[in-house]
Amino acid sequence: QFENKSTLFLIAGITIYYACSCIVFNKVYEASDNIIDELFHVPQGIAYCKRNFSYWNNKITTLPGLYLISSIIGLSEDYCSTYYLRLVNLIASGLNLLLFVTILRNIYGNQFKILLLGFNLALLPPLYFFSFLYYTETLSLLSILAFSICTLFKKNYFLIFVCGVCSVVLRQTNIVWIGMVFGHTMLNLILKSSLANQSVLLLLGSFIGFVVWNGSIVVGDKEAHVATLHIPQMFYFLLFYGVFSLPHVLNTTLSTLKTMFNNKIKVILYLMLFLTIVHYNTVEHPYLLADNRHYTFYIWNRWFGKYDFAKYASVPAYVFLLFNLYDNLKDQNCITFLLPYTLCTFVALSLQKMIEVRYFLIPYVILRMRFARPSTKLVVTEFIWYFLLNYVTFYVFFNKQFMWKDFDYPQRIIW
């Protein structure tokens, strides 16, 4: 009986999610022309939608997965427009919600609060915002979730391979998360089938061959995305965790402070290590300093870039958040997860010179689904927190406008 009620709640919840999101979607469409990278993505998507596969904008640095999906919806040229291209991501966001709940039920069991937790992940402010734009983030995450479910439930090895290929074609760096899932499942001996193992190994090997052939993980504008050792990206990810897991951070603050007090030597060593890293390895990308359409621009220019001491003053927060994160993982912090996850997060983030909130989405979602079993009160608090952040985000987007000399329409601020 609970199973039936749970399914009905899920269907009702997804219906409400789409109904509310469609209202926001139409307002975003009416209020904006191409948003930042959509300047490249939308014309490329329209070209593929119209079956013009010879057109390619060299400013694009990802493989054409997003645009190939656009070619599928282009059964009629009437659908080859910004509206319908963006709509694909909105539909995908609802599928993400469904997969969130599926995975969380497997981890925590079938409880009502798990449904709400799935909605919280779908409403994660940066992820939710990009569900209304023609960016790769939503579909990229969908492909990773689908791949994870296929391995989790030991689906057909060919299906695992197909999901993995789709994931990489949508975003090359997804190969890192495929490697993480593979590493985790191998360490746990979940994948019993040698064929399943071979399917992932074949995918990993094929991707390595592509990188060698291409000379880079990036296609298109390689100069803007040169691999650079940038370890502080891990610290910025901790700040991302601190903001979007604030209810969980506050809930375990006393426990974390007690742990730090009992491990003073370890805390001092972390402080010394982190101070050394930020001193010698803080990197500024030219785009970060020049593009005032992202929140990271304002954070950097009003704190990190404005005061010489800021990068050092932030180190205690990094150390606290690291201990706090470990505290929130608790019984989920097994070595079979933490080892491949930490290595893959380092590879995915610390070779990126540019600080982009989008880069933190997949590692955060993976981590968030491993938190210790939350209370209903905590899940509800998180929902309220995300609602407030989303409200502020869209308020700024709709009301804060400014002109750039190279554009004849107003620019807006996004994540």
State where each predicted segment sits.
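Membrane-interface alpha helices of multi-pass inner-membrane proteins
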Residues: 117-119, 126, 145-151, 157-172, ...
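Start-transfer (signal-anchor) and selected internal transmembrane alpha helices
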Residues: 1-25, 266-268, 333
